[in-house]
Amino acid sequence: MIYQSPTIQVELLEDNIAKLCFNAPGSVNKFDRETLASLDAALDSIKQQSNIQALVLTSGKDTFIVGADITEFLGLFAQDDAVLLSWIEQANAVFNKLEDLPFPTASAIKGFALGGGCETILATDFRIADTTAKIGLPETKLGIIPGFGGTVRLPRVIGADNALEWITTGKDQRPEDALKVGAVDAVVAPEALEAAAIQMLKDAVAEKLDWQARRQRKMSPLTLPKLEAMMSFTTAKGMVFAVAGKHYPAPMAAVSVVEQAATKGRSDALQIEHQAFIKLAKTDVAKALIGIFLNDQLVKGKAKKAGKLAKDVKSAAVLGAGIMGGGIAYQSASKGTPIVMKDIAQPALDLGLGEAAKLLSAQVARGRSTPEKMAKVLNNITPALDYAPVKHADVVVEAVVEHPKVKAQVLAEVEQYVSEDAIIASNTSTISINLLAKSMKKPERFCGMHFFNPVHKMPLVEVIRGEHSSEETIASVVAYASKMGKTPIVVNDCPGFFVNRVLFPYFAGFNGLLAEGGDFAAIDKVMEKQFGWPMGPAYLLDVVGLDTGHHAQAVMAEGFPDRMGKSGNDAIDVMFENKRLGQKNGKGFYAYSVDSRGKPKKDVDPTSYELLKAAFGEQKAFDADEIIARTMIPMIIETVRCLEEGIVASPAEADMGLVYGLGFPPFRGGVFRYLDTMGVANFVALADKYAHLGGLYQVTDAMRALAANNGSYYQA
């Protein structure tokens, strides 16, 4: 053994080829500080051996290296620029040391080689992947750029255009795609991986492969003619900005770094990367996006823990077909859990099966599935007009019409047919779980399971704990949601649960602006373009449906009359009473039609303005700051109330609910990250300016105390 540490082992194989194996404790290899220090020491030990002729990098795990240890990032990025620069220069010195070894090097890549893992393989002369490999630089998804030489080496290996696509999208690349562009030199079966890498090194030692020429190319400026370079980078900037927009600076910064470094050798090019990395690491966007990643890990960790308490869900059932039932059935079956789809009407079953078939056909058309897989998934969905096939289900999801009496009746019925230990969940967006539990003989096996529409696209599931729900029930539904590929957050029962409870105060702020003559299209523009929502409030209400919004608003007003009660009609009422239901009937705030390509089209409709003018008078202009304040303050305060009341367990889970359930702008990180970035005291001062507008604008005592102590919701 040449070197051994808890994370890395180095041994000498036949023919004087050294093997460096990444094998950290735990399930995966990460590039944390300990691993980086071990790699540095291992390379020093290797350099001291005079007989080594080549080096192969391998992994003792199912994956190569999943990337940097992101849990270290926020603390590290809070350091002074000088400290951060010192860290990044030391890290890069290790990668340079690997690249500068006086003999050929190769990486044997299996599973993920992402971020720092990808930058490790780029520092070697040859790269051989097996068929399980996924390679990529996802850093821009975290608001930063690669910091261990990725922006320098990748363009010199696969060309600037290909490298910019990899870096700016942050997507994982399949081995066959990596082979096409030259990021890897061969793709082999997993059992042949190490032997293939060693054979390539033997060929290099025997001078059949010119490893020194390959290495020199990575050390040198890019070989791009000046005019071609200018055209390439100008085109890239336009394309990247069109996708990333102004709120996500990292992809554009990556293009600039590659452009500036194009004429430089390795040393100068790395300095350009370092400076850009440090600048981005200090941004609020990086803090927000890294925060989302860490919050996602926390939520997934909780779900994994729940799996230990959970009942094993081998089969499921959904009551109520149609679009929602079909979506739930598709999601369950496509992720491997067979499901019965039960309805009282054959046309509804046909619609549900049609929805599942449509979603599967789209997967096949995009090359993400095959006709054989599609048939297998459809065979996992059993349509039924009676309860007989439901009796074997481990979990039953009730998804009938959103009406308390109908749901209560269906829940009471299904309880008679299922096994004693089957778990029953209601997919409801507004009806109290405690109320529905009254219709059940065993309320301890019952909880809420709120899917968001469309089911196949929306990642969030709210698992709602009723006062009688057992821990096993909650754990089992959380585990089932995870198995379906969803991100579950557990919330306690209250009107609107968590997501809808905080959404409707936002709509109330919007209604308030319209009642004073605000222009809904202008408000949407501000909330989309400036704040960053995927849809402004008027457009979102049209998509949700004004009938659904009208009903949910009434539920919220009844549940929280002091804050959400109304004294008269608002804009939602005006649209609903004039049968303008949104996209579903082609007219809401906007008018909807289909364009020549069959895609839905949204247009401003003069009729909406006439109706609003008749109800609220002449239009009045509001500036962007006031629009943002008056819509967001109520949502933010209500989110804080949910945390204080224990409806949601932590700021992290609340922020994930907002990002995954509502599309809260990821670059802002969620309500609590947004509050911390803004400063709680600054927010309280802003809210106090609007406190005269009513209870939705009045901060809680606990918020005021936190502001007075200069506190924050996240611990740095």
Swiss-Prot record:
GO terms for biological process: fatty acid beta-oxidation. SUPFAM superfamilies: 6-phosphogluconate dehydrogenase C-terminal domain-like (SSF48179), ClpP/crotonase (SSF52096), NAD(P)-binding Rossmann-fold domains (SSF51735). The record marks 119, 139 as: Important for catalytic activity. It comes from the Bacteria. Residues 311-716 are annotated as: 3-hydroxyacyl-CoA dehydrogenase. It holds the Pfam family ECH_1. Pathway: Lipid metabolism; fatty acid beta-oxidation. InterPro entries: 3-OHacyl-CoA_DH_CS (IPR006180), 3-OHacyl-CoA_DH_NAD-bd (IPR006176), 3HC_DH_C (IPR006108), 6-PGluconate_DH-like_C_sf (IPR008927), ClpP/crotonase-like_dom_sf (IPR029045), Enoyl-CoA_hydra/iso (IPR001753), FA_oxidation_alpha_subunit (IPR050136), FadB (IPR012799). Its EC number is 4.2.1.17, 5.1.2.3, 5.3.3.8, 1.1.1.35. It catalyses: a (3S)-3-hydroxyacyl-CoA + NAD(+) = a 3-oxoacyl-CoA + NADH + H(+); a (3S)-3-hydroxyacyl-CoA = a (2E)-enoyl-CoA + H2O; a 4-saturated-(3S)-3-hydroxyacyl-CoA = a (3E)-enoyl-CoA + H2O; (3S)-3-hydroxybutanoyl-CoA = (3R)-3-hydroxybutanoyl-CoA. Gene3D superfamilies: 1.10.1040.50, 2-enoyl-CoA Hydratase, Chain A, domain 1, NAD(P)-binding Rossmann-like Domain. Substrate binds at residues 296, 500, 660. Residues 1-189 are annotated as: Enoyl-CoA hydratase/isomerase. Keywords: Fatty acid metabolism, Isomerase, Lipid degradation, Lipid metabolism, Lyase, Multifunctional enzyme, NAD, Oxidoreductase. NAD(+) binds at residues 324, 343, 400-402, 407, 429, 453. GO terms for cellular component: fatty acid beta-oxidation multienzyme complex. Heterotetramer of two alpha chains (FadB) and two beta chains (FadA). Involved in the aerobic and anaerobic degradation of long-chain fatty acids via beta-oxidation cycle. Catalyzes the formation of 3-oxoacyl-CoA from enoyl-CoA via L-3-hydroxyacyl-CoA. It can also use D-3-hydroxyacyl-CoA and cis-3-enoyl-CoA as substrate. This is Fatty acid oxidation complex subunit alpha. The lineage of its organism: Bacteria, Pseudomonadati, Pseudomonadota, Gammaproteobacteria, Alteromonadales. The gene is fadB.
